[in-house]
Structures are given as structure tokens and as C-alpha cells.
Amino acid sequence: MSQVAHFTINAEDLPRTRRFYEKVFGWKFQAWGPPGFYMIDPKSAPAAIALRGSLQQRREIVKGTRMTGFECTISVSDIHATEAAVKAQGGTIVMPVCTLAGIGQLLFFQDPDGNIAGAMQYDEAAD
């Protein structure tokens, strides 16, 4: 099966957005290629987890803003610590933590540059 192999975070203010993801998720970035382009150091991210994907009806996570393109959800070990880190680094929680039975706890956030993504603490025992 083919799998997603790369994603890109688009930003106007690269230093601010870079700091946000470094502080919230512990990622490290390295300048690579053309000016204004950075690669996430794969050694700074946790080991890969099994691919989880879905297809769904287009929706609004932020009222009046329909999601476009691919929706990215980042696996985290502590959803509440991630929620606090997002807020501390200038992000906004746009969908509060909710529990998906048998899957885990999910939230959606908006980074300081306006990108919307999810964070999921996987837990098969969630109810």
C-alpha cells in the first residue's frame, strides 16, 4: 500500500512558526535547499506509527472556514500537555479535547501562522 511520505507546513513568518513546532512537538528543523525551506530532522520525531487514514465529508473545524486539502493529525503522548504547549506558544485551540471511543483523545489547533492541524493521543481503551 502507498503511504504518505512527506507533509509541508506553509507559513508566512517562518521563524515564529518554526519556534511553535519546536516548542510544542520537540521537532528540530534544518535549512535545506532553497532559501526559506527547512526539513524536519527525522531523528527529532518519534518512531513511525502504523498509517491511519480516512476519507470524510468536508467540514468546518473553525466556523466559516471549510477544511481544504489534507488534514494532518500529529500523534502525541499527552494530549493535555500538548494543549497547554499550543496555548503557551501562541497557538489557539479550535476544537477542544474530545474522546473517540476505542481510538483516543483528539483536539484541533491553529498555529500562529493560521494552519489548522490535529493532535491525537491514541488509546484503544478510551471511552
Model-predicted segments: where are they?
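Core segments of cupin and vicinal oxygen chelate
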Residues: S2, T8-A50
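N-terminal beta-strand motif that seeds the catalytic metal site of vicinal oxygen chelate
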Residues: M1-R19, F70-I74, M120-D127
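Vicinal oxygen chelate
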Residues: E83-D127
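Mid-chain, well-packed structural core segment of small domains
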Residues: T65-G90
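Structural motif
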Residues: V4, A50-G53, G69-E71, G104-L106
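Conserved, structured core segments of small domains
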Residues: D41, P46-R66, S75, P112
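Short glycine-enriched loop/turn motifs at secondary-structure junctions
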Residues: M1-Q3, K63-G69, L100-A101
